[in-house]
A protein has these predicted regions:
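Basic, often amphipathic N-terminal segments
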Residues: 13-88, 107-166, 179-186
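Short proline/glycine- and acidic-rich turn/helix-capping motifs at secondary-structure junctions
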Residues: 91-100, 168-179
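A structured binding-face within diverse protein domains that lines the active/interaction site
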Residues: 101, 105
């Protein structure tokens, strides 16, 4: 728990530089092999001229400008029972209605994780209530006009066999202080 050992957060794949607006997050991380597969897709998209994706591949449970300790405590209670967790890619989703949009893989998971994530989200006063849309962000803050081409390129670069994902770690990530606290591990 606490600060990363064995490398900087950037070496571990967290976004940098950190925006003052970057929220605290409770995140689920993939096994290294799957993370590398996603990064290969990011690299292929960048080679085609799309914006470079620097974020570490993850699935967000909830986020807040300043996460309340009771939300982190609840996540630490609920997530160990459901990690590792299996996910299945079921489509693409676009978040945002303004000039910059986010493209993500839409995911389905177990009822147990879905229930836990909804409880954690509901406990977060800055969250969306008991709603959770499991997804893995593939394109962050993309210009709206690039989204159709981005999705087409993403589909071309993604193996049709890469449908199953796993979450092997849950963590509380604080971008402002570059601190990651592991809440559950497989």
């Amino acid at each position: 728990a606490g600060r990363y050992a064995g490398g900087t957060p950037q070496q571990k794949g967290e976004r940098s530089p950190v925006s003052k607006a970057s929220p605290d997050n409770i995140l689920l991380y993939l096994p290294q092999k799957q993370e590398d597969q996603v990064r290969e897709i990011f690299a292929g998209l960048a080679e085609r001229g799309f914006p470079v994706q620097q974020q570490r591949p993850h699935i967000t449970v909830t986020f807040s400008p300043r996460m309340q300790p009771e939300v982190v405590d609840l996540a630490a209670q609920l997530l160990p029972a459901v990690i590792p967790a299996d996910f299945r890619r079921v489509g693409n989703v676009i978040f945002g209605t303004k000039r910059k949009q986010t493209v993500a893989w839409l995911l389905e998971t177990t009822n147990e994780l879905e229930i836990a994530a909804r409880k954690i989200s509901a406990a977060n006063s800055d969250g969306r209530g008991p709603r959770w849309t499991p997804h893995l962000t593939m394109g962050l803050r993309l210009p709206r006009e690039e989204v159709p081409g981005y999705i087409q390129a993403m589909d071309e670069l993604t193996s049709s066999h890469f449908k199953e994902l796993s979450a092997v770690e849950a963590a509380y990530w604080r971008p402002r202080t570059q601190e990651k606290t592991v809440l559950a591990e497989a």
